[in-house]
């Protein structure tokens, strides 16, 4: 690091000077113990002194002002850093602020003759603008200069502290001076390129720095010289000016103060017209909240520098600007001054309602947490646009935080101090939260180039122990500590007084002892323990993977919230922990593996409408939000590809998003409330669950079935864990070689079930005359299903059908026309639900029917039909009545005036009776017979077809063989 840059660290030097300068210690004692009774509220009109270090404001009487000036003068002479301002009161001295632009980096000479001429011209404007009092008066002019030229910019102040003027008079003087050709000529002779615009018009009212004070990380202006001008009203044309001798003998803080009235050299001179002005405009107390924030918050100073790296579009273009504001608001509510400062970088927008827009945006950020971007995004943007400058600022930020600890605690570093710096260095990469067991858990955001498992990139990885931090403390942190050593040695090489050199020697010795600790295992463990509290982000675990539209994939994060899906393979702030190892690639039907799978799907599900419906249904597995309450029951005798397809979906999604479920979950009795159910907990957070290979005639537990297919919250718990409540989000498929037995007549359950029966069988020697027999290919089960290329291709197919479902059916499976599955589901229901079979065969919708049936008449008709067609049994009328109320007849049942249920708008057929004009069977089938859904013949690009009841499918062709 360049030596001269060490002097930029005001905050470090402030800490150090408290240790070795008795004058600074005395000043702090005065402020905290004696002058605290004169503290004022921020914005108070009584304020006359502002301490930028602490942000405190004072209304000091003249006697206390003199005491403060005396302490400040002693600190100034010792070279102490100070940040005190005085508020220009209703009547105060005049300060002129000249901001010069030069053609060179050499400071202009500004010799006494030129400054004397400048004094004369300034006084002429004062005399012409104000009414000077009668008699002879001495008016003093002081010139303070900027210490150095910075990139062709320079400046100086003209202080006329004794002449007490009203703010309006000052403004008039400044306005007339701006157009003074003589002044412009004098400045031009000094090499100034902007003489017409270099005088700051706001210097009449802004708080003025007391002599010896400065802005943060700036050197104070230095006194060049002073002049004494004598004015006598009896001889106004004779105005002698001479240079002040032995000026350093005076208390310059006091003499150069614009508000002091008790100077030894400077005596106040009041203008009569200004004294007579009763209603003088108020001088505003400037808001120094940003300066105060940056003095006390190292991270705010750091962010201020980072924000300066962002290109203009970030404060000009509304979307980018709003993102910056949201990021600051979400990082800390205290960073409002940073947002205001950044917004003001575009004056045109700020002056046309910018403040109001910022106010609204800031409030929106505090209310709407879904747009959770933070300072991490600001860091990313800055690094993206200015990588080298970003690196320098980041390294400087670490150094500043550590240096403040070193100087504050005399070189001794403890666990928390190191942890604080580590947090500044790695706070964007690690997060800690407390899990359900009360343990602190570490998460690391995985970036390219570091060791990882497939799929962890661009996600938050759970760490048992943050090993990277352990290594970082010993290998990387030591370099920051080496810079502190350089900083201390730099001061040891300077011509300081003996007491200051002794301070730095002791500091270096203590710090060297602290440096060795970072290689000690037990010390590092202590640092990590302290870091847990700093890295803690409450409820972080609860926010992980809560966005159902975001899916962790092998090459990043896939967002399916928009169409088309978007792969996020760069920095982001989505809290994603789970993932599948599959890499997302956009759907490409020309990909050989995609062609292979499209052909396989065509073979496994020969009916085009059923194939599309099932693929639409399976595609919803990539979405983990609330879905339509459906479950697919897939019947097949074996060797028909259903198991391959279900397993492929599960393998593609991975264990985080999919789960194979134990069939006992559907067939066993429900556990009692206090018992654990690990099988049911497997559905928590999953987008897909499947059952397979059941025994013959398995009876499904209808209460569990309802719980699994109905939307809403469910409760369960793992072994030795607390009861949890979660939402059912899984797309579920149950496959079997035998039909399930579902002993319920509840229409609410049946309408959530879909049934499909496999027609195809894969054989070693298929019958060429049987279109339902296909040549088996063992590679699908033993080779292809494990191949990453096959898995990637199938994942792209799932995403393709998800996008198609959103675009063409608004994401609703029930809108997809599929007569094959509708008819097979109806047939399956009738085989299980005799009440439904009776309704679909014997009850017809008849709008013109005049007959109204009591519910008891419907019960009797069903009992007679059942005894004739099924089996003779004793029926319980009350149970049958309840079942009818929950059947498909529900919408036709009404209440009669005597509060009994009646069936209206329907007619019950007798045996062999036919339909009358205008009547139709209830249900999707026709008189109980299956719809004829033959195998669709070939059609090109079957995956592009959209099922539509008004447009029967065209003939299809097989996808080309890869």
UniProtKB/Swiss-Prot annotation:
GO terms of molecular function: ATP binding; helicase activity; hydrolase activity, acting on acid anhydrides
Top-level class of the enzyme under EC nomenclature: hydrolase
UniProt cross-references to InterPro entries, sorted A to Z: AEP_C962R, Helicase_SF3_DNA-vir, P-loop_NTPase, Phage/plasmid_primase_P4_C, PriCT_2, Viral_Helicase-Primase_Cplx
Pfam family, one: AEP_C962R
Residues binding ATP: 636-643
Domain SF3 helicase: 607-775
Taxonomic superkingdom: Viruses
Inducing stimuli: Expressed in the late phase of the viral replicative cycle.
Keywords from the UniProt entry: ATP-binding, DNA replication, Helicase, Hydrolase, Late protein, Nucleotide-binding
Known EC number: 3.6.4.-
Presence of keyword Ribonucleoprotein: no
The family this protein is said to belong to: Belongs to the asfivirus helicase C962R family.
Name of this chain's protein: Putative primase C962R
